[in-house]
Regions:
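Active-site flanking loop/helix segments enriched in acidic
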Residues: 9-39, 75-86
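Divalent metal-dependent phosphate-bond-processing catalytic cores, especially two-metal-ion Mg2+/Mn2+ enzymes
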Residues: 28-63, 71, 80-83, 127-128, ...
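An active-site-proximal "capping" alpha-helix that borders the catalytic cofactor pocket
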Residues: 39-47, 90-105
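His-Asp-centered metal-binding catalytic motifs of divalent-metal-dependent phosphohydrolases/nucleases
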Residues: 60-89, 97, 101, 112-125
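Short, amphipathic alpha-helical segments
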Residues: 88-95, 106-113, 140-144, 148-151
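Alpha-helix capping at helix-to-loop junctions
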Residues: 103-110, 118-129, 156-159, 163
C-alpha cells in the first residue's frame, strides 16, 4: 500500500506542477509540499519506532498508518492548481484530501480517510464527527484516533523543523522578516495569550499581529499527543529555537522567558519522558 501511495503522491505532484510551472511562486509551493509530505513521513516513522502503542501491531497496520501519514496533504496539489487558476474561495485541504482518497478503493479505509479529513482541524471537530462517533468497534475507533494523532504530531514536527532550520522558508511561508514589521505588529493580543496560558493551541481567529502568529506556532506544542514527539522536538532544540525567533517579533524578554518556562514545564508534566536512545 505504501509503495502505491508514493506513486500516487508523485502523480499528483507532477501532474499539478506541470500546470503551475509558469509561476515561480506556485511551482515552488508545489515543490515544498512534496518535500513536506516526505518529511512528515520521516517524522511519522520515528514516532512509530519509539511509541509503545505501535509495537507489535503488525506490518500491515504499520503500512496503512504510514500511508495515511504520507498522503495527509494529498489535496494540497489540487489547492495549488486551483489558486493558480484564480480560485478565491476557501479550500479545506484536510476535508478535500479525505474525500479524494475515499473515492480510491485502495485508500478508502476509514483509518486513512478520517484522520486525513481532520488532521488540520481543532481536535474537538474530530471527536464530534458523525462518522467517527458511529464507529461501533472500539478497536477500530482507537486505531482511527491513534493514526490521527500520528499525522498531527508528525506534521507539526516537520513544520517546526522547516521553520527553524530553513529560515528562507520561514519568511515566505510563515511570517515576514521582523525588520519589516511595525511596532504595532509586535504585540501579543490578549486572546492569544489567554489560549497560551490555558495550554491550548491558539485559535487562529484571534491572531491579529505577527507576534500572535509566531506564538500560535509555539502553542502547537500543547497539541502534541505522543511523548516521543515531544522528545524529538526537544532533541532538535526546536522549542527553544522558536522562542528565540519569537523574541525577534516580540521584544519582551521577561514575558518571553516566562512563556518559555511554561512550555518546558508543560512537556515535563504531561509526558514525563526521559531522553530517547540515539538511533
Amino acid at each position: 500500500m505504501l509503495d502505491g501511495a508514493r506513486k500516487l503522491l508523485l502523480d499528483e505532484y507532477y501532474g499539478n506542477r506541470e500546470i503551475v510551472a509558469v509561476s515561480p511562486h506556485y511551482a515552488a509551493y508545489a515543490d515544498e509540499k512534496y518535500r513536506h509530505s516526505l518529511q512528515v513521513l520521516g517524522a511519522g516513522n520515528f514516532i512509530i519506532r519509539h511509541e509503545p502503542w505501535f509495537a507489535g501491531l503488525g506490518e500491515e497496520f504499520v503500512d496503512l498508518a504510514k500511508t495515511a501519514v504520507l498522503l495527509h496533504d494529498i489535496a494540497r496539489f489540487d489547492e495549488i492548481r486551483e489558486r493558480f487558476l484564480g480560485a478565491k474561495g476557501p479550500f479545506d485541504h484536510s476535508v478535500a484530501g479525505g474525500e479524494k482518497l475515499r473515492k480510491i478503493p485502495l485508500y478508502g479505509d476509514v483509518r486513512i480517510t478520517l484522520p486525513i479529513k481532520h488532521h488540520g482541524h481543532l481536535i474537538g471537530d474530530f471527536y464530534k464527527d458523525e462518522e467517527y462517533c458511529a464507529i461501533a468497534d472500539p478497536v477500530l475507533k482507537e486505531e482511527v484516533e491513534k493514526i490521527l494523532f500520528l499525522i498531527r504530531d508528525a506534521d507539526k514536527i516537520a513544520n517546526f523543523n522547516l521553520m527553524m532550520y530553513d529560515q528562507k522558508m520561514l519568511v515566505p511561508l510563515f511570517v515576514p522578516y521582523p525588520e519589516e514589521v511595525s511596532d504595532k505588529r509586535r504585540r501579543i493580543s490578549a486572546g492569544v495569550l489567554e489560549d497560551f496560558w490555558r495550554h491550548q493551541p491558539v485559535d487562529r481567529r484571534k491572531i491579529r499581529t505577527r507576534a500572535d502568529e509566531m506564538l500560535g506556532y509555539v502553542s502547537w506544542i500543547y497539541d502534541l499527543n505522543y511523548g516521543s514527539s515531544a522528545a524529538f522536538c526537544l532533541r532538535l532544540n526546536l522549542v527553544d529555537m522558536m522562542f528565540d525567533v519569537l523574541q525577534r517579533f516580540h521584544d519582551d524578554s521577561g514575558l518571553n522567558g516566562k512563556m518559555r518556562r511554561e512550555t518546558g514545564d508543560f512537556v515535563r508534566e504531561r509526558f514525563g519522558f526521559s531522553p530517547l536512545p540515539q538511533s
